[in-house]
């Protein structure tokens, strides 16, 4: 590696002179696919399975995106090898879902036996749990019977398909058998016949924790409806979400310049209007989960020397070699959403750090490494000009985006350097209307109902009067939707917990809460 070359060869001029340095860079996706196609036959022969070309492409694409810290083609080869081994194992062993369900039945049987032993010595408090165990056992047995039947059908069809592939006289039966197998599997195969893109995505999901559904999503279809997907979580900000979605579509289709991040946005607006929730929703939609959100609170970086915390200390300073908070986070997750919160509170020297990031998509850390930001979406949040926005919308509720941008331009120009201001897109978040606030109240109360159902098995009936009261209480200009959580935590949830504890202390367990 380059570090070893510097350590052992460069320091010895005589030794360095006797070697010609050949720089070997990581291949691009097309070259990596070509290399894997050359290796594919060896792995297929070793594991005794067929590896499709879409599996090769998926191995390269998904490994580049989700397996950080390693290089292509090495990580794609490991991914393809593991996927091939899984397909081979699925043909020779009982599928993992069946094994897991049998283990669940065994665990329930052990718990049931322990409870019966307690009852035998006079403990009568386990009747409700015994009934629940019986219901769980019935449900698992029904699922197990259905899956074992389907597994038998899949295994029979798979064996017939493998036999047809080796028998030239039966080649015409392959298409019909393949259709039957697809109909039986219904997008949830218990065993694999070939190594395909789904098999590779399953391995990535197990290694990284990214949901399989996110890995298998059609990115083009997802981008077309991105603003609608975001609007399910961010309520009442349609124009802002539309602006973000349009910019991201331009980046993903290759129309925007390729030497910068996917998008750089400054989200400006009053507190509690959905700016942080937008970052969470984008991480979930684009990169498979909220774990792909990197949050940096810039209110902690009000001194010029705090720059080293973000990018790492330079040589000779305390902390050299430990990396920076931002640079190391992006190195580990190059496909992520970077949220720079409260950007107006950061020192100007800290903001100067982002000129090259916004423009060319990279930052050089304290050790001289170039950290690639080109696959990130960068969101900055700020309350600059919030009072002006609220004042204009109070006077003219139907003010256009252009009018709001003209209103904010002097405020932003006073705070940000013109060169920095030209490097990001400003997105304005409006004060939430009553209808949007009521929708958010309903979502928050629904989350409380789900928690009660999950922990206590209780059904919840929420009166309209409660939703109306919470909505009216949250229509304050300075707090927005953030006040909903405050009201729930301070007034609603303490009363609920008191009632629940009182009922449980009295030995009663209510099934419905109103």
Per-range role (PLM):
Residues 1-514:
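AAA+ P-loop NTPase nucleotide-binding core of proteostasis motors
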